[in-house]
């Protein structure tokens, strides 16, 4: 199945603690159905000291379920994603709300 949300997409959080916030996807894990979004779903982790790394409490992004994020359209609102096959046979993603191409 083609990916509706990809690395580099600007997305908005639809539910949860960060509802309404936007960020850029920097990693997608399709098998787990989750994505990592820069600046969203920040958690604190206690890091044990190693020879190469200092110990302490670090903040990092936790995965967020793909069902809880949506691509932000050109109008700044979240939109669902569909697919369209162009005349030359190329498959592109389109915004369901406006019909505009997302990439291509």
From Swiss-Prot:
One of the GO BP terms on file: translation
Native organism taxonomy: Bacteria, Pseudomonadati, Pseudomonadota, Alphaproteobacteria, Hyphomicrobiales
Subunit structure: Part of the 50S ribosomal subunit.
HAMAP family with a match to the protein in the record: Ribosomal_uL24_B
GO MF annotation: an example: rRNA binding
Name by which UniProt lists this protein: Large ribosomal subunit protein uL24
Function: One of two assembly initiator proteins, it binds directly to the 5'-end of the 23S rRNA, where it nucleates assembly of the 50S subunit. One of the proteins that surrounds the polypeptide exit tunnel on the outside of the subunit.
Superkingdom as given in the UniProt entry: Bacteria
Membrane-spanning residues: none
Keywords (A to Z) from UniProt: Ribonucleoprotein, Ribosomal protein, RNA-binding, rRNA-binding
Family from the record: Belongs to the universal ribosomal protein uL24 family.
Any one Gene Ontology cellular component term annotated for this protein: ribonucleoprotein complex
SUPFAM superfamilies in the record: Translation proteins SH3-like domain
Species of origin: Rhodopseudomonas palustris (strain HaA2)
């Amino acid at each position: 199945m083609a990916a509706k949300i990809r690395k580099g997409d600007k997305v908005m959080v639809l539910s949860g603690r960060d509802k309404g916030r936007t960020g850029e996807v920097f990693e997608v894990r399709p098998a787990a159905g989750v994505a990592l979004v820069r600046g969203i779903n920040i958690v604190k982790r206690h890091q044990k000291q190693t020879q190469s790394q200092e110990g302490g409490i670090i903040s990092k992004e936790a995965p967020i379920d793909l069902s809880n994020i949506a691509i932000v359209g050109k109008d700044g609102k979240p939109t669902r994603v569909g697919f369209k096959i162009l005349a030359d046979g190329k498959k592109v993603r389109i915004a369901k709300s406006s019909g505009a191409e997302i990439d291509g």
